[in-house]
Amino acid sequence: MKRLGLIGLMLALVGAPAAMAQTNCTPKLGHPPLARKGMLIAAINPTVAPIQYIDDDGNIIGLDVDLGNAIAERMCLKMDFQSTQFATMIPALKEGRIDMINSFMFYTPERASQVLMVPYGASSMAIVVPKKNTDPISGPEYFSGKPFGVELGTVDLKDAQAASEALQKAGKPPIDIHTFDTYATVLQALSAGQVDGAFIGTEQAFYYRKKGQDFFRIALTGYDPHAEALAFKDPALADAVVAVMNEMHADGAFDKIFKPYGHCVLPGPYKVTTGPIPTPDCPPQTQ
């Protein structure tokens, strides 16, 4: 397996401007369990447009930002997003440097055994290939013996590894997996011809295509749907956020946040979850 270093737009460990808390209410939690008094610090990887990304003015925006700001406001806290490489988020949470992970993180039982996870939405993976490749593609197995790009530390990396192992057991060449720090660098590698195909989020694939990046074709969507989850270390903080999330779902605030993005919302009630969960029942995205 090969690994390329960080290139392009990834900004590691750079803070986004904090969203202001309401001035006429009392914070629901103090320090501890919060890492800093009056502030909710969340790790985010702002390279997953339109869910979380950096706009032309250098601000981190997107669905996850809208969600985090709404949660913090109801908790009477300032929201502080820390731009963090995805693979380092769980260690940072365990070390107490951040309060939560709010970064398009897929729920898995393995992750839920390490940190407290609260599923709330759902998404899936897409396979993208150079535009000139018109072959029908039904999964990563197509890339037997070929270079294939994925983001480091993600479910799509594990999916690619599992497919590669299955190919080897069948006596076929494994997938030549290349890992990258962000979806943006995955696409850069695809554009440069370093890989023959790649996994990126289905929403990201359609977003980049709408933005005029026409060097790739979306060969497959809806692969391996997973729930997305917030992640915490401290039970009191997790419970407080869960209470706010259920309140937001009941009063319609969740729908107002998610609807503009066309993003799938799980029905709730929301809770800290462990072990296997059902595959999310969300309509496939087509644009």
Explain the meaning of each model-derived region:
Residues 87-91, 104-113, 159-163, 191-224:
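A ligand-binding cleft/hinge motif common to bilobed small-molecule-binding domains
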Residues 23, 66-74, 133-134, 141-142, ...:
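Extended ligand-binding regions for polar small-molecule ligands
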Residues 23-104, 251, 260:
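Extracytoplasmic small-molecule ligand-binding "clamshell" domains
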Residues 69, 73, 78-142, 278, ...:
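Acidic, polar ligand-binding/catalytic clefts
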Residues 122-129, 209-246, 264-287:
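Periplasmic-binding protein-like
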